Amino acid sequence: MIPAEYFEDIRLAVDCLRRGGVILYPTDTVWGIGCDATCSEAVRRVFEIKRRADAKALITLVGSVAALERVVDPDAIPDVAYELIEFSTRPTTIVYDRASRASGIAPELLAPDGSIGVRVTSEAFSRALCEAFRRPLVSTSANVSGEAAPETFAAISREISGA
């Protein structure tokens, strides 16, 4: 269920994501740039906006353990990962050996060895967004690579917000 105060923003974000667009959104760490993690064109656009080398990985954000198990082959998720997700008090990204072949994850999000970094978000807006979109999101800080990550929307540079 989407909280009423987020409904319109989430509706607009999901519409943009479904069209292959890129969004700015609050995450459980900083303000982020996001896109559909299954859309190669959108993922490449995020790299372009950030002026980030393809070799520097982006993480994938999901809203639940069930969504994680659609992105990562459940056999590749060790028990300790479930414990970290359940008990960690801080945002934790875990690198898994391989994505599920059925996940449709854009190949640009996989490391050369096939591994993938995924975080199960606990932040209310990003979790509601993941649940409404029903696909994994790319999550990376809303800054040009090498610059400070914005903790507030107002701190996002015009270069990023206007891209």
Can you describe what each PLM-predicted range is?
Residues 1-163:
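Active-site-adjacent structural elements in enzyme catalytic cores
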